[in-house]
């Protein structure tokens, strides 16, 4: 009987102590930060040799060599863009950004992105996968890093995108600032 009371007492004390200690959540701190730039050159019917992206679907009556009017609603673009560590398109490539974006809002410039960085350099080997909404007119936008392979196996985090350069509908450069919060 005495041992049962002792076990019950220990159990009650442990329960009381566990509920008395506030459950503090660890603040999220990035385990790795990276910065890349990718350069997109939209095919316009005349630049096949240099183009890195193309319109593959458009609203009825709209050309596949020119974005739809107004907010480009309904255009789907696939891309295979060079990734560099600097702003310059002519700098050494460290990989390719491969995926698509869909202009999905009628009254403002917004797209939905899904793409993968395929990295093959002396510094990084593997892939990083991204997905999310991109309100293009915002100065900075956050999208999810949903996973990776190789050096980035099971990584997750946030990528902050900035439009670093914009030359009409022909060319744009995005700065991608990646913060990984889960690293293996």
Swiss-Prot record:
Glycans are attached at residues 50, 120. Keywords: Apoplast, Disulfide bond, Glycoprotein, Pathogenesis-related protein, Plant defense, Secreted, Signal. Transmembrane segments: none annotated. One of its GO terms (biological process) is phenylpropanoid biosynthetic process. GO terms for cellular component: apoplast. Its main location: secreted. It is found in: Secreted, Extracellular space, Apoplast. Residues 1-20 form the signal peptide. Disulfide bonds join 31-183. InterPro entries: Allene_oxi_cyc_Dirigent, Dirigent. Pfam families: Dirigent. Induction: Upon contact with the plant pathogens fungus Fusarium solani, Pseudomonas syringae pv pisi, and the fungal elicitor chitosan. It comes from the Eukaryota. Dirigent proteins impart stereoselectivity on the phenoxy radical-coupling reaction, yielding optically active lignans from two molecules of coniferyl alcohol in the biosynthesis of lignans, flavonolignans, and alkaloids and thus plays a central role in plant secondary metabolism. Homodimer. Belongs to the plant dirigent protein family. This is Disease resistance response protein 206. It comes from Pisum sativum.
């Amino acid at each position: 009987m005495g041992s049962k009371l002792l076990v019950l007492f220990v159990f009650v004390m442990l329960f009381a102590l566990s509920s008395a200690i506030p459950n503090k959540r660890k603040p999220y701190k990035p385990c790795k930060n990276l910065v890349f730039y990718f350069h997109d050159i939209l095919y316009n019917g005349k630049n096949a040799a240099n183009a890195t992206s193309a319109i593959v679907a458009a609203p009825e009556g709209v050309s596949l060599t020119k974005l739809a009017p107004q907010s480009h609603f309904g255009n789907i673009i696939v891309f295979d863009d060079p990734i560099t560590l600097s702003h310059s398109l002519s700098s050494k490539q460290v990989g390719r950004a491969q995926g698509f974006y869909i202009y999905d809002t009628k009254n403002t410039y917004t797209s939905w992105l899904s793409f993968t960085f395929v990295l093959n350099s002396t510094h990084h080997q593997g892939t990083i996968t991204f997905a999310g909404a991109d309100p293009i007119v915002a100065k900075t936008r956050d999208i999810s890093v949903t996973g990776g392979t190789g050096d980035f196996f099971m990584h997750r985090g946030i990528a902050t995108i900035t439009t670093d350069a914009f030359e009409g509908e022909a060319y744009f450069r995005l700065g991608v600032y990646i913060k990984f919060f889960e690293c293996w």
